[in-house]
UniProtKB/Swiss-Prot annotation:
Keywords: Ribonucleoprotein, Ribosomal protein. The gene is rpsI. This is Small ribosomal subunit protein uS9. Belongs to the universal ribosomal protein uS9 family. Residues 18-27 have a biased composition (Low complexity). It comes from the Bacteria. PROSITE patterns: RIBOSOMAL_S9. GO terms for cellular component: cytoplasm; small ribosomal subunit. InterPro entries: Ribosomal_Su5_D2-typ_SF (IPR020568), Ribosomal_uS9 (IPR000754), Ribosomal_uS9_bac/plastid (IPR023035), Ribosomal_uS9_CS (IPR020574), Ribsml_uS5_D2-typ_fold_subgr (IPR014721).
Length: 163
């Protein structure tokens, strides 16, 4: 009689395992996340960005300047704003950013990572899958290779003369 109860438990466990799936939620990133403040830090090359997202109407403040003043390039503006556009949250958050170090491209990449991490902190369940799939939560670890002794640059060697 005890054997029969164990068999029924095994069958139930097998049914539970077949219902489990590792696929991401198709509804992720549909813009239904909670509207609350969030904070994230992003780094790229030598740039470090500290990003705070607060509920608002979509204003950007980067080191006390607007997004258009700080990044005149539309390409960099699009890169910085891409996590918010992906989650369809345009006009729902104001971004206050402090960024230093590096050049414009490195700073834009650092801000993008900071914004993505802030959105992830705001609503992990709704936002994480879409942000991760788009690659916004991955830190770009590429940095400038150091110059080596005896070479002109990191890999550029002096011209070779056979005779």
């Amino acid at each position: 009689m005890a054997e029969n109860t164990n068999d029924s438990q095994v069958v139930e466990t097998e049914e539970e395992l077949t219902n489990y799936t590792t696929e991401t939620n198709a509804g992720a990133g549909t813009g239904t996340s909670a509207i609350e403040p969030g904070y994230g830090t992003g780094r790229r090359k030598e740039a470090v960005a500290r990003v705070r997202l607060v509920p608002g109407d979509g204003k950007w403040t980067i080191n006390g300047r607007t997004l258009e003043e700080y990044f005149p390039s539309k390409l960099l503006q699009r890169e910085v704003n891409s996590p918010i556009v992906l989650l369809k949250l345009e006009g729902k958050f104001d971004a206050i950013v402090l960024v230093d170090g590096g050049g414009t491209t490195g700073q834009a990449g650092a801000i993008r990572l900071g914004v993505a991490r802030a959105l992830n902190a705001i609503d992990r369940d709704a936002n994480r899958a879409a942000l991760k799939k788009a690659g916004f939560l991955t830190r770009d670890a590429r940095v400038v290779e150091r110059k080596k002794a005896g070479l002109h640059k990191a890999r550029r060697a002096p011209q070779f003369s056979k005779r």
